[in-house]
Every structure is written in structure tokens, then in C-alpha cells.
Regions:
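Exposed substrate/partner-binding surface patches
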Residues: 1-147
Length: 147
């Protein structure tokens, strides 16, 4: 099963124990303390850009498909602020990379105001099917908050 963009956010925000050499230094006690560190968001912006880390520790590109919803993406789970409920987004753009760490080619998929998706590839533009939008080459997702 391919991971989802939700899985990626879950991993990014997950708690991590800081201990030993990585322990947190408490200024009040002047000592290191073991603590859990995690990420929560107070509020999400009207435009949310999610960039996937597509490069492994060895410098090899990770071409695994990451499923991303096109409409009604709910990112409320990691919001801890005053506006927890209104975090529903629609995808309107995707950047793609073809190639490796030494070079490659970029394309963009963009949803026009007419509701249709288009691929921008250098000087060519073509209309796309929704089934083509998310691929193993997608690395940057542009979401717009629903009003």
C-alpha cells in the first residue's frame, strides 16, 4: 500500500524522545532533561504547500507514490489552536521532478479556474485527467483552504 500525504504529515509531526546528548537543556535548572518533542500547528494558512523529501540519506531519489486527495483534504488532526475545524483544502497545483540528484526535468500540474487540470511541460500545455494528477514523481503539493 502506498503511503498517503496524511501518513507523511503524521511522521513529520510525530513525537520523538530527546535524551542523552540530544536531551533538552533546561535554563532554569542548568541541566539536560529527557523530553518528548513533537509538532502541532496553531493555525493553518489559506494556502498550504506540502513539500515531500524525495531524497534518501544516500542521495538516491525516492520514487514512491504518495497518495494525495484532490478535494476535501482534512488537515485538522495536527492543529491545536483556535481554528481546529476549518482545515479542509482542495489541491490546485503539483510540481513534479523527473530524473536524479544530478539533474532532471520539472513539470507542473495546475487546476485552472475552469476546474480543468493542465500539465505545463516547458513550452507545451495539455489538458489532463484527474487520474493523472498524483504520481510517483510528485513532490510539491499546493492546497487552497475551502471557505
Amino acid at each position: 500500500k502506498s503511503p498517503s500525504i496524511y501518513d507523511c504529515i503524521e511522521l513529520y509531526c510525530s513525537k520523538e524522545m530527546l535524551s542523552g546528548e540530544n536531551a533538552w537543556f533546561n535554563d532554569k535548572t542548568n541541566k539536560k532533561e529527557d523530553v518528548n518533542r513533537g509538532i502541532l500547528f496553531w493555525n493553518l494558512p489559506s494556502v498550504l504547500i506540502i513539500d515531500l523529501k524525495r531524497w534518501g540519506e544516500t542521495g538516491r531519489k525516492i520514487n514512491k507514490l504518495v497518495n494525495a486527495p484532490l478535494v476535501d483534504a482534512d488537515f485538522s488532526k495536527h492543529v491545536n489552536g483556535y481554528n481546529k475545524e476549518n482545515n479542509i483544502y482542495d489541491l490546485y497545483g503539483v510540481c513534479n521532478h523527473y530524473g536524479g540528484v544530478q539533474g532532471g526535468h520539472y513539470t507542473a500540474f495546475v487546476k485552472n479556474a475552469n476546474g480543468k487540470w493542465y500539465e505545463f511541460n516547458d513550452t507545451s500545455i495539455r489538458e489532463m485527467k484527474e487520474s493523472e494528477i498524483v504520481s510517483s514523481r510528485s513532490y510539491c503539493f499546493f492546497y487552497r483552504k475551502k471557505v
